Amino acid sequence: MRVLLAPMEGVLDSLVRELLTEVNDYDLCITEFVRVVDQLLPVKVFHRICPELQNASRTPSGTLVRVQLLGQFPQWLAENAARAVELGFWGVDLNCGCPSKTVNGSGGGATLLKDPELIYQGAKAMREAVPAHLPVSVKVRLGWDSGEKKFEIADAVQQAGATELVVHGRTKEQGYRAEHIDWQAIGEIRQRLNIPVIANGEIWDWQSAQQCMAISGCDAVMIGRGALNIPNLSRVVKYNEPRMPWPEVVALLQKYTRLEKQGDTGLYHVARIKQWLSYLRKEYDEATELFQHVRVLNNSPDIARAIQAIDIEKL
């Protein structure tokens, strides 16, 4: 079984990847998207999104990292894909699933689901630009406002020469509403294709992962939000281990406050610690109290002191 850590814009950056891969057994991480418009991006853009390039495209604990590109113009997707692998990325991924209004308004992400030909052209251009021994993956949803084009979308990915396909089991319009998850549809796509299909959506624990794999027939899953709810989720999903005890979660947060974000203006940890605690509150009652304590703090040093002051031995 493979477990991949999903790309989550504004959430799963290099520091969080470092922390989560240290306490997990992820097979692969995908970066936050690199927005490609009409130019070959400077090298520094790739290094900013993925400092792991300085470590052979691996996190400090050794987990491989693949870059995700977001755009709609095949030529520029291809040129930036070529640059990415020249810099050392282990393959590239094409974002065809982001539901953000901002992203969709500029023609990227899930907007491509409306026209599978665009997905085909983009993925094909990337495949031709990247050496054959390196993977080119694509992440999609079941469609824009319905699943009517799901097979056309999947066929476009395979015919373009992609190595594997990640399918989020909802349409763009369904967003992240739990009641709409359709693992069966992912399974129908898997049966149709000859390339590996990775299931994504509503995987929160061992039981949901087993159910997803049973229904879809997939032997690989990608997890996103759940990885923040339960920091050791890949081990829960892979080995049926118990969730990380709260004292260990606090220790992880304490380490987080000690990590430095390149280019930080002093507000990084203010937003990110509060954000992570909002996810943790879904699984840990203790996180609610801590969140209430830090939510009124508005600078990184105060946040760090509040987290560091917790005596783990007394928890």
From Swiss-Prot:
Residues annotated as signal peptide: none
Catalytic reaction equation(s): 5,6-dihydrouridine(16) in tRNA + NADP(+) = uridine(16) in tRNA + NADPH + H(+); 5,6-dihydrouridine(16) in tRNA + NAD(+) = uridine(16) in tRNA + NADH + H(+)
Top-level taxon in the UniProt lineage: Bacteria
Enzyme Commission number(s) from the entry: 1.3.1.-
InterPro entries attached to this UniProt entry: Aldolase_TIM (IPR013785), DUS-like_FMN-bd (IPR035587), DUS_fam (IPR001269), DusC (IPR032886), DusC_C (IPR042270), tRNA_hU_synthase_CS (IPR018517)
Keywords: Flavoprotein, FMN, NADP, Oxidoreductase, RNA-binding, tRNA processing, tRNA-binding
Cofactor: FMN
Active site per UniProt: C98 (proton donor)
Broad class of enzyme this protein falls into: oxidoreductase
UniProt GO molecular function: flavin adenine dinucleotide binding; FMN binding; tRNA binding; tRNA-dihydrouridine16 synthase activity
Binding site for FMN: P7, M8, E9, Q68, K139, N200, G201, E202, G224, R225
Residues of the site described as Interacts with tRNA: R35, N95, Y176, R272, K274, Y279, R295
One Pfam family in the UniProt entry: Dus
Role according to the record: Catalyzes the synthesis of 5,6-dihydrouridine (D), a modified base found in the D-loop of most tRNAs, via the reduction of the C5-C6 double bond in target uridines. Specifically modifies U16 in tRNAs.
Family membership noted in the UniProt record: Belongs to the Dus family. DusC subfamily.
Name of this chain's protein: tRNA-dihydrouridine(16) synthase
Gene: dusC
